[in-house]
Structure formats: structure tokens, C-alpha cells
């Protein structure tokens, strides 16, 4: 049986726009006629949605499912952490609460949940043509990589091509993108197929040199997406055809990897 292809959106940090871009990609691919499903291995959020069967998943994954034209299911977000305090979270596995765990205890036992993640991903890959995967935080948190189930480990499991997103609005987008690439292993770096400069304001022509520099240094295509006042973080909780990304500009280096 042919398994679904996978595209993964990873970011240089939390809040760079992964959820909205993943939602937009689900919408675009659905409108192109593909059977699409979203996936996020592990989400940390108080904002939960309830599936038709009563399971809890991250609200973003529910919005992504609606954008893809399918009903949300627990396999789309097999692990949900709902913070209760700075060092304690309620653990929801496949839609069901399993208890509260201290941060150290969760990270220490995190690998025991990897089979749950694999099985959920495999379920979706058997049924759909394309899986659009959202990462969590950054793939380059060196002190957490041994237990990171949400980024490059998932990309390898799904054999996914990765889009790396940086947020120009918060500043330092060159360091964000190039620094993250530098901290990845060679095999991880090879999965990254494009860079996205997100939340750009103003005249895109003023960033043409920036796009060229990023493309030449990373040897990857670079895309620039505008900041939109119409899209708020809460926008991913609704289904909207307006979530089709509008590219302000892009560049490809003649030497970038294909």
C-alpha cells in the first residue's frame, strides 16, 4: 500500500507562524483536490478542541483538519500537554487525560510515548494522500533533542520534506534561520527544502538583498510572507479560504540543493 507523502512546517521558535502556515497549506492542498490531513505529534496548549468521539486535541489541529475538509480526530494530535503550573502539565494521550506530570517526569518518560506517535502517524498515512505536519518550538534545542518527539524525529519517520519558518517581525531573522540550520545534523539539514521569512511588513523590495543573502548562504529557496492584520492567532480556530498564503517574493540560489 502506498503511504502518504509528508510535508512538515518547522520553526526557529514558538510563535513564528507554524500553525497558521500549516492551516493554510492544508487548505491549499485540499482545494487542489488532495486528500489531506494535519498532524502534530505533541502540542502544549490550554486551547483544546473536542472531536466527534469526545477526544481532546489541540485547537490548532482541529482548525487544520477543517481547513483540509476532514473531521478532527485524535490521531492528528496524539499527545497534548495542558499546563497547570510552571512545572506541571495534564497529559492527554489519544484524546484522553492520563494524569498530571511534573516536567522532569514527563521528559524522562517521553520516549515511552513514541510508539503512540508512530501509530497515529501511520494511521493517517494509510488513509490520506498528503500529511501536513506541524513541528513544535524549534528543532535545534540542543538540551532537549534526545527526547524531542515533535520535530526531526517525526520528519524522519514520515520521510517528510521540511519548510523552516522564521519570524522577521521579532528581529534577527538571519540568525534565526541560518543558526537553526547550522545546529542541525547533516541528515536533518538535508530534509530542509525551503526557508520562509514570515510576518514581513512594508515594501518587499527593501528586503530583496536579504532574500538573496539567505538563499546564497543556505543554498535553499526563500519565500517571504506578509504580516496580515486579518490573521490573528485565534484565526486558526476557524475555517477560512482566506488562509491561502500570499507570497510577497522569493528567490532561489543557482547553487541551492534540488
Label each residue range with its predicted role.
Residues 1-258:
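Flexible phosphate-sensing "switch/lid" loops adjacent to ATP/NTP-binding sites
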Amino acid at each position: 500500500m502506498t503511504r502518504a507523502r509528508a510535508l512538515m512546517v518547522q520553526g526557529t521558535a514558538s510563535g513564528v507562524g507554524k500553525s497558521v502556515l500549516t492551516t493554510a497549506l492544508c487548505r491549499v492542498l485540499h482545494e487542489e483536490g488532495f486528500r489531506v490531513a494535519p498532524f502534530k505529534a505533541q502540542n502544549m496548549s490550554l486551547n483544546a478542541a473536542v472531536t466527534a468521539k469526545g477526544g481532546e486535541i489541540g485547537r490548532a489541529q482541529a482548525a487544520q483538519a477543517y481547513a483540509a475538509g476532514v473531521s478532527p480526530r485524535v490521531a492528528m494530535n496524539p499527545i497534548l500537554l495542558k499546563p497547570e503550573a510552571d512545572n506541571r502539565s495534564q497529559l492527554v494521550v489519544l484524546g484522553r487525560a492520563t494524569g498530571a506530570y511534573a516536567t522532569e517526569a514527563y521528559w524522562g518518560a517521553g520516549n515511552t510515548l513514541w510508539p503512540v506517535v508512530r501509530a497515529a502517524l501511520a494511521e493517517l498515512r494509510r488513509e490520506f494522500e498528503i500529511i501536513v505536519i506541524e513541528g513544535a518550538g524549534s528543532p535545534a534545542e540542543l538540551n532537549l533533542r534526545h527526547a524531542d518527539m515533535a520535530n526531526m524525529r517525526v520528519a524522519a519517520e514520515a520521510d517528510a520534506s521540511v519548510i523552516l519558518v522564521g519570524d522577521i517581525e521579532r528581529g534577527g531573522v538571519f540568525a534565526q534561520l541560518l543558526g537553526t540550520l547550522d545546529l542541525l545534523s547533516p541528515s536533518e539539514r538535508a530534509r530542509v527544502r525551503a526557508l520562509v521569512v514570515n510576518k514581513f511588513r512594508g515594501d518587499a523590495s527593501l528586503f530583496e538583498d536579504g532574500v538573496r543573502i539567505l538563499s546564497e548562504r543556505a543554498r535553499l529557496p526563500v519565500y517571504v510572507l506578509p504580516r496580515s492584520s486579518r490573521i490573528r492567532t485565534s484565526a486558526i480556530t476557524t475555517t477560512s479560504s482566506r488562509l491561502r498564503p500570499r507570497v510577497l517574493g522569493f528567490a532561489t540560489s543557482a547553487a541551492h540543493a534540488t
